[in-house]
């Protein structure tokens, strides 16, 4: 008997790299999108940590009044933030090499642009990597579609909104109290709470939380016992098994009796599509709302108070909301503007600024 041995052709270094990048046997899948995601997210994370701890004050309003955001300049975890780049920079791309010195770059808030741009590229690539891994494994592509909701929301507040407002100084600060400040100012300038797209987003997030809790509790309460009473139910299941872990008929029957029959799903695919689509569509709408308000297509406003036949104001909840928004706007950039833009321009409009008399 004759045995023929043929030497295996050695793959080039590039081919080995390609096989490693696209291999689904790695503990963590890299993928071609990952080759860009990993360095950009590492860069954004590193710069964010350094800036959050030690960045000097930033002239955010462009009026030579720097705002300190780092821990070493007196902030704590709650009040600290990476302060957005200066209004003097506007929408200009401001990498380190565009500044005359590192001190100038820090003073004008260069780290904010560095973090935001690398972060956005990183999460875009993470979404692409989700699609790539699904493709390699023969899965359907809906995971990356669902992830597009938070990606679109981040893009709206970090990129679209500053573009619409004309300056990256209007972007969301990278910190806890900075995020709240951004929300309050957004309400003051755009009346976002009265925008229907934001209302859909609230319904999506809160509704998604409710449906998630309902689904999780129903499934956990209707597990099929495959073990004896003295063993843990966990021993009755294995990852990837073909059999159902829980009894959807029992869950459907329980929920149908708790509310009414047609409030419950009896089809697992329809149920899980609903659980995925509800919050995703809601967050998509919120991102679209922020993106349109970026160009000042704002929420509903009721700036004209209701008047009686004598010209007296009939107070409504809209008047309370208007007064709150004006108060927010007065506090915002108080050294850059003498008055809120609503009060400083245009014809005078009757607004209820007097409290009704309380008899009692």
UniProtKB/Swiss-Prot annotation:
Gene3D superfamilies: Photosystem II protein D1-like
CDD domains (alphabetical): Photosystem-II_D1
Residue ranges listed under propeptide: 345-360
Disulfide cross-links: none
Annotated site, Cleavage, chain positions: 344-345
Lumenal, thylakoid domain ranges by topology: 54-110, 162-191, 296-360
GO cellular component, as recorded: plasma membrane-derived thylakoid membrane; plasma membrane-derived thylakoid photosystem II
Annotated phenotype, changing residue 238 to V: Weak herbicide resistance
Binding-site residues for chlorophyll a PD1, renumbered to this chain: 198
EC number: 1.10.3.9
Membrane protein topology class: Multi-pass membrane protein
Enzyme class: oxidoreductase
Marked site: Tyrosine radical intermediate: 161
Record-level GO BP terms: photosynthetic electron transport in photosystem II; response to herbicide
Single GO MF annotation: chlorophyll binding
Resulting phenotype, residue 264 to A: Strong herbicide resistance
Additional detail: Cyanobacteria usually contain more than 2 copies of the psbA gene.
The family this protein is said to belong to: Belongs to the reaction center PufL/M/PsbA/D family.
Known function: Photosystem II (PSII) is a light-driven water:plastoquinone oxidoreductase that uses light energy to abstract electrons from H(2)O, generating O(2) and a proton gradient subsequently used for ATP formation. It consists of a core antenna complex that captures photons, and an electron transfer chain that converts photonic excitation into a charge separation. The D1/D2 (PsbA/PsbD) reaction center heterodimer binds P680, the primary electron donor of PSII as well as several subsequent electron acceptors.
Protein name: Photosystem II protein D1 2
Gene: psbA2
């Amino acid at each position: 008997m004759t045995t023929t041995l043929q030497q295996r052709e050695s793959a080039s270094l590039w081919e080995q790299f390609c096989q490693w990048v696209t291999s689904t046997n790695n503990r963590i899948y890299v993928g071609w999108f990952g080759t860009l995601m990993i360095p950009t997210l590492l860069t954004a994370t590193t710069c964010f940590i350094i800036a959050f701890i030690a960045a000097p004050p930033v002239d955010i309003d462009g009026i030579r009044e720097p705002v300190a955001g780092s821990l070493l300049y007196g902030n704590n975890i709650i009040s600290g933030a990476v302060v957005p780049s200066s209004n003097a920079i506007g929408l200009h791309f401001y990498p380190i090499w565009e500044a005359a010195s590192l001190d100038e770059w820090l003073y004008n808030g260069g780290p904010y642009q560095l973090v935001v741009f690398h972060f956005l590229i990183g999460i875009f690539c993470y979404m692409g990597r989700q699609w790539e891994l699904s493709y390699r494994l023969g899965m359907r592509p809906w995971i990356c579609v669902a992830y597009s909701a938070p990606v679109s929301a981040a893009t709206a507040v970090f990129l679209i909104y500053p573009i619409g407002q004309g300056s990256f100084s209007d972007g969301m600060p990278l910190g806890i109290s900075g995020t709240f400040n951004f929300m309050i100012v957004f309400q003051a300038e755009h009346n976002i709470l009265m925008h229907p797209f934001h209302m859909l987003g609230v319904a999506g997030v809160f509704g998604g939380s409710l449906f998630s809790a309902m689904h999780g509790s129903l499934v956990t309460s209707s597990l099929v016992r495959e073990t004896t009473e003295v063993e843990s139910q966990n021993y009755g299941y294995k990852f990837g098994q073909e059999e159902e872990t829980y009894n959807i008929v029992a869950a459907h029957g329980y929920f149908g009796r708790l509310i009414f029959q047609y409030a419950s799903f009896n089809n697992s695919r329809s149920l899980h599509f609903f659980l995925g689509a509800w919050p995703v569509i809601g967050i998509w709408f919120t991102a679209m709302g922020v993106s349109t308000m970026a160009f000042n297509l704002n929420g509903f406003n009721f700036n004209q108070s209701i008047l009686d036949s004598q010209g007296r104001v009939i107070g409504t909840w809209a008047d309370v909301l208007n007064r709150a928004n004006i108060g927010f706007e007065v506090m915002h950039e108080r050294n850059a503007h003498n008055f809120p833009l609503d009060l400083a321009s245009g014809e005078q409009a009757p607004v209820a600024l007097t409290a009704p008399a309380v008899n009692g």
